[in-house]
Regions:
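C-terminal peripheral helix-coil segments that are non-catalytic and often amphipathic
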Residues: 1-3, 100, 136, 140-144, ...
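Helix-turn-helix
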Residues: 7, 18, 22-60, 64
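Generic hydrophobic, amphipathic alpha-helix propensity
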Residues: 15-23, 40, 65-69, 73-77, ...
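Hydrophobic/aromatic residues within well-ordered alpha-helical segments
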Residues: 58, 69, 73, 98, ...
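Hydrophobic alpha-helical connector segments
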Residues: 64, 78-104
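Short, well-structured alpha-helical segments
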Residues: 92, 96, 151-162
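Short secondary-structure transition hinges
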Residues: 100-136, 170
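Amphipathic alpha-helical packing segments from all-alpha helical-bundle domains
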Residues: 121-146, 155-159, 183
């Protein structure tokens, strides 16, 4: 009996993840209001009203996508800061982790970047609280490396760096080789932060990237 319940729960979790992935892909491509729960269910291979066993509404599904992003970012950021022995290394890893989100989970990141205005106010408030905690991790580390900045300046700088990394989400095609994009985004983030990237040898990379022209929209 216990094994049956566990297997059923596992199938339910897997189906829920399929629904979230399908929703992220469709909403990123069409926009929130142009996608229906039926569209999402069909894309996820969930028949009829079965999708409502996992999400009461499209609004709840959208909120779950935002929770998925911010919870993952927050857990990873906390682990990076807690486990790192070097502030420069920690900041480099924070930048790299955010770059990884926008590159490897592009559809999910696009929804996070574009659709916050479609969340209910209570959901936006909860999201903002978690976002502040995420920013706090960056601000704490950057404050150790940039002691000349006050709290307001540190937060503005972190916002700018994250915005620079997420700017790639405005473009469907960057015109660059895929393997060059993460390096460019990391360089942009560190440029805004005013802190060079950590290297194991103790010398941060300052080599200029010749392909720094902004991509065409």
């Amino acid at each position: 009996m216990a094994q049956t319940v566990t297997a059923r729960r596992s199938r339910g979790d897997e189906r829920r993840l399929r629904i979230l992935a399908a929703a992220a892909e469709l909403i990123a491509d069409r926009g929130y209001h142009a996608v229906s729960m039926t569209d999402i269910g069909v894309s996820a291979g969930v028949v009829g009203p079965a999708i409502y066993r996992h999400f009461n509404s499209k609004a709840d599904l959208l909120a779950a996508l935002f929770e998925q992003v911010i919870d993952t970012l927050l857990v990873r950021a906390s682990a990076i800061v807690e486990q790192s022995h070097d502030d420069n290394l920690a900041l480099t890893q924070l930048v790299a982790d955010h770059v990884s989100l926008v590159i490897e989970q592009r559809e999910l990141a696009i929804v996070y970047y574009r659709e916050v205005h479609n969340l209910a106010e209570s959901q936006r408030s909860r999201l903002r609280r978690k976002q502040r905690l995420y920013l706090d991790e960056w601000v704490h580390v950057l404050g150790e490396l940039r002691p000349e900045l006050d709290e307001t300046e540190l937060r503005a700088t972190v916002h700018g760096a994250i915005g620079a990394v997420q700017s790639i989400l405005q473009y469907r095609d960057t015109g660059m080789a895929p393997d060059r994009v993460p390096t460019l985004l990391a360089r942009m983030g560190h440029s805004v932060l005013g802190v060079q990237r950590f290297c194991p040898e103790g010398i941060a990379s300052t080599q200029r990237d010749p392909d720094t022209d902004m991509p065409k929209r």
